[in-house]
């Protein structure tokens, strides 16, 4: 699925605001090496094995972000039957949640998806906010 430049810019702005940007390798709250906009370093990344404090450029940060967000959007398309019918605002919210939670955990929001799939966005919002995730990430939610 193609996304407009405006959609991608807004998604990047929102996720960057929520996740923060770190241009050096750090350990996340679980002790995993991470860099950029919450990018979990993989064995195939050039940053792998470099250790905490290894610096990357903003260009590399953007590259990693777009790799991650394209995977995230692809997973949303595959897992959510109604994805293409959701309004852009809903897609932005769900993509942000998927980026933060991972698609597997996001798909456990059964009541929220029931409301979304029936077009009841107010109820979907209530269901999304009535979760442990929303309490943990208060301002983001």
Predicted regions and their residues:
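Catalytic glycan-binding domains that act on GlcNAc-containing polysaccharides
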Residues: 22-29, 85
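Substrate-binding/active-site groove segments that recognize
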Residues: 27-51
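Structural recognition of the beta-strand scaffold that forms the well-ordered cores
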Residues: 14, 34-36, 93-96, 123
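Residues that flank catalytic or metal-binding motifs in active/ligand-binding sites
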Residues: 11, 29-31, 90
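Alpha-helical segment that forms one wall of the substrate-binding/catalytic cleft
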Residues: 48-82, 88-108, 121
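Long, amphipathic alpha-helical surface segments
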Residues: 1-24, 39-41, 62, 66-67, ...
């Amino acid at each position: 699925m193609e996304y407009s430049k405006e959609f991608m810019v807004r998604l990047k702005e929102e996720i960057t605001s929520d996740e923060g940007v770190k241009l050096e390798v750090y350990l996340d709250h679980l002790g995993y090496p991470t860099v950029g906009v919450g990018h979990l370093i993989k064995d195939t990344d050039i940053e792998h094995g470099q250790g905490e404090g290894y610096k990357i450029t903003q260009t590399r940060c953007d590259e990693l972000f777009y790799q991650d967000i394209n995977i995230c959007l692809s997973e949303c398309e595959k897992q959510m039957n109604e994805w293409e019918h959701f309004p852009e605002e809903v897609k932005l919210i769900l993509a942000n949640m998927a980026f933060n939670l991972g698609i597997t955990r996001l798909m456990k929001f059964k009541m929220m998806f029931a409301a979304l799939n029936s077009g009841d966005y107010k109820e979907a919002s209530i269901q999304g906010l009535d979760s442990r995730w929303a309490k943990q990430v208060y301002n983001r939610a």
